[in-house]
């Protein structure tokens, strides 16, 4: 039972694709490299960052990130270097400017328009409801007679 539990724990731990030969000797630079690798998407994998991807291009990107850091580039310069070569697709969170700005705002705008439309539709339905006509005295008397029988 203990062996199964231990095996389950080992299999459940996340596996990082960073190979030992890629790790930098400076822990500060390595931490920065891992942080940058978390925000860069693998160009050939779907929804996987380069830190966790086993694809060859991800390995090359991880090495390029580390080379740029060793050369003295800032985090932003490293990200720009990779983005210039692979396009904005490699960013998990694209920059909020230009055409991307439209994409960021279209979802909330559609939601606001839909909620406004629902509100107006419900408000219009209430107005269309006709009030129930009140019975005249003669009709009430006739109704009472019918109910007595």
UniProtKB/Swiss-Prot annotation:
Key words, A-Z: Cytochrome c-type biogenesis, Heme, Iron, Metal-binding, Periplasm, Signal
Q: Which residues bind heme?
A: 42, 45
Q: Name one Pfam family in it.
A: CcmH
| Superkingdom assignment | Bacteria
Give the UniProt entry's GO cellular component terms.
periplasmic space; plasma membrane
Gene Ontology molecular function, alphabetical: metal ion binding
Signal peptide range in chain numbering: 1-17
Q: Which GO terms describe its biological process?
A: cytochrome complex assembly
As for subcellular location, the record says: Periplasm
Q: What does this protein do?
A: Required for the biogenesis of c-type cytochromes. Possible subunit of a heme lyase.
**Belongs to which family?**
Belongs to the CcmH/CycL/Ccl2/NrfF family.
- This protein's name: Cytochrome c-type biogenesis protein Ccl2
* Organism whose genome encodes this protein: Rhodobacter capsulatus (strain ATCC BAA-309 / NBRC 16581 / SB1003)
Q: What is the lineage of its organism?
A: Bacteria, Pseudomonadati, Pseudomonadota, Alphaproteobacteria, Rhodobacterales
């Amino acid at each position: 039972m203990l062996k199964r539990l231990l095996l389950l724990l080992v299999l459940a731990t996340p596996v990082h694709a960073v190979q030992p030969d890629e790790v930098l000797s400076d822990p500060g630079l390595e931490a920065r490299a891992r942080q940058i690798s978390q925000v860069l998407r693998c160009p050939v994998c779907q929804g996987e960052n380069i830190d966790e991807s086993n694809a060859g291009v991800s390995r090359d990107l991880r090495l390029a990130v580390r080379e740029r850091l060793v050369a003295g580039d800032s985090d932003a310069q490293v990200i720009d270097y990779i983005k210039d070569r692979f396009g904005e697709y490699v960013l998990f969170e694209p920059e909020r400017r230009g055409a991307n700005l439209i994409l960021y705002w279209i979802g909330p705008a559609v939601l606001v328009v839909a909620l406004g439309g629902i509100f107006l539709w419900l408000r219009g339905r209430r107005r269309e409801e006709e009030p129930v006509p009140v019975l005249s005295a003669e009709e009430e008397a006739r109704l009472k007679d019918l109910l007595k029988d």
